[in-house]
Amino acid sequence: MMCFSSSAKAQVSQDSLAVDSIKVDSVLVDSIKPPMLPQPKIDKNKPEQIIPWQQFRSYGFNSVTNDSLLRWEIWPNWGEFYAYRKDAISFRQGTTGRFDAFQVSGFNPYEQTFNIEGIDISNPITGLVNYNYIPHHKIGSVHELKSGGYQSEIELKKYYILEPVSYLNYDEAKYDYRNLEFMVAQNFSERTHLELTFWDRRDGDNYQRNDVLGNQIVARGYHYLNQNIQIRSIFLRNQFENEEPFGYFVIDPLAFSFDRFASSSNESNATSKTTRRDWITGVYFRADSNSIEHMGLEITLTKNEFNLPFTEDTLNWDLRNYSAKAFKVFDVNSFSLKLEAGARAHSFKENENLLKSDWSDISLSSQISVNPLANLEAVGRVSLIQRSDGYTGTEVGGGAFISLNNKISLKFDGAVFSRMPSIQELYWRSINFSGNTDLKNETGISLYGELELNLNSFIKIGTSGRIKQAKNDAFLGSDSVFVNSGDISSISGTVFGSFQNHRFEIESSATVDAFNDINPQVSATPLDYNEQKIWIRNNAFIKGYAFDRAAFIKLGIRTTFSPIPYGSKFFNTELQYWQANSLETDIPAFFRLDAELSARVRSIMVVMRWENALDGVGQLGYFEAATFPMPARRLIVGIRAQFRN
């Protein structure tokens, strides 16, 4: 009570003194000063939150493979991956670094396009794809579409750590086979990434005049301007110096009189030199950090140099290509639309083999995706390309994908197309071969479908097939001039069954490919039509931990069996062209077995592949492409090592 009274008296005294005063009451102000609270410390070194970019993926594309699967496999080049697909028939020339061909689900080499993050690696003159140009050790994912043609989209691996990353790949086998590749990558911040890869490769010396020497450089970078804008750039250079045998002299394919000393090449002193450079730079946008990119603008510069002097003639060109492309994606609930426009210009700096010195084209396309149900997707596509020489190409197609209770999946796709002749087929000029400016567009319809049944969590069976009806396809005629075909039909089908659990991977498949000329043109009567090909494949692998779980090992075999002879495609080196109409002796029936082992210990993998292990057992050797013998037995040993910090 006394304390309270004293306080009251003091307050009264102060108030009485302040009645006539205009001074600020400092005691009152101090009495309401808020208490000091602890302030949070600002960590200037805290990493910036950047959500990884998601690139746009075209509608209707299926997943083929990814980095997690590829790391256990050993492929000298990306063509080798296709050679062992269950739905493919391969036509290889015997050494890596060459223009190999693959018939994938009935789609021939001239119906295929490959896109590496915006770079179209098709040859602008011939339309062919060189699988050696694809940096397959850098692949993150692969998706494909089978409709009017075959389209493959390849996305490269991404790295999401700030520490530097490097890897070393080395493969070696007998004769002159060797692969050496190393990469260095660094995220300098959460926004900026740079990487550089060099790949040296060589093969050959198992037969005369088949040595291959090449290398590849990939420089790549991307930078986030902010959370929703990214700039990406890729430089890709491929260089090869190849001895060119122009095929080998074959009397009896069954006798297979080939080795490194006893083989007669059709050309004894021809060497080709190839250099291709691609550089693409683009800016891309997304609505927010959790969205897929919805808009982009790309500019691409490409330089193609090729030189091949031989006895009768010389192939030589230096072609420059400039292109620009823009796309925009619209998403409204279950409806998505992509619009795309592009323009390209092509001009020769040097040219000895084409009547055309330059050309250009513009393209427009749209894709539509509708998801009316959770297990149903319907897609549609329209594309148009207009070339400066007056030719126009179109394609209208679509399809649907249905999944039922994760047990049954059904997909079908189809297209009506009008495909332009290639620049080579129209304007080629050499001593022995000529283009034809009177060629018409190939027109037709293509239908593709596939069905897969998951019998349980381990067993899967399925089938797929393609039917094509067309006319005016371009072929090399009997007078060495390109001509249009009559009505043609082709059918291809595959059936397979697979078993997979934590210990075993087993798969068996059979592929049939048939081609028929319904109404042959007189000028094309010598062509080798009406061919049927059957390939049967079996794969069996066992996998698991070993050495007290210190290593994970995968071991198995792959077999290929072709039970009937058939007329093969033939690579015309003088044209740099895959003829569908080889007049050589049919390829005999053959079989092949490859044994593989891969083992991972921490960040190091050891891979081994015993190619053509049964060579000499039941057959002396075999061919996949007419006049080009496949290599004998060899053991490839490789090391994959990744380093951080």
What do the PLM-derived regions correspond to, one by one?
Residues 25-164, 169:
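Acidic, small-polar-rich N-terminal luminal/periplasmic segments of exported/outer-membrane proteins
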Residues 126-128, 168, 279, 284, ...:
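Exposed, low-structure sequence patches enriched in small/polar residues
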Residues 208, 230-290, 302-321, 415:
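Flexible loop and strand-edge segments within Gram-negative outer membrane beta-barrel domains
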Residues 171-173, 177, 199-224, 268-274, ...:
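Outer-membrane beta-barrel proteins
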